[in-house]
Amino acid sequence: FAVLTGCLRVSKESIFTGLNNFRVLSITDIRFDEQFGFTEEEVKMLLASYGLESHLEETKKWYDGYRFGDADIYCPWDVINHVDSLCVNSNAHPQSYWINTSGNDLVKRFIKIADNTTRDEIERLVAGEFIEKSIRLDLTYNEIDGSINNLWSVLFTTGYLTLDGTPTPNSFRLKIP
């Protein structure tokens, strides 16, 4: 049994790849949507268990923002590291604990080939706005280079972007978490 998150769909699921009996749930599925991170109630309980209740707002501001199915989810890696830092120093400031934990070569490759429209959309996201895009939840690594529009599917399925509201069948409203 394994759970893979923050990656594109695995291609060629078969008995010959070692990935048979494979079940895929995407970020938009509501089944188990609260199981892929911490809910706000769980974050409150965690902070309370260490006497850190006064740090809820900063924790929410920094680490809440992911949407799985119908659930707003906190990033567990960031929350755990922040609580650990606060246990060592109650004046510790929130940080981006994900920095330099993954290779961003794929994102850099997309940005190099981005046209002006794509660059403008990236700037809108960085400015805190949202964009509306069609997303391929079934996109695999073998298909990535097929279109610059796959950038949005990659950023969404790997957690760099999250939903802003409920998606329609043809359109996802995306923002930076």
Residue positions per predicted region:
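Phosphate-binding site recognition
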Residues: 1-177
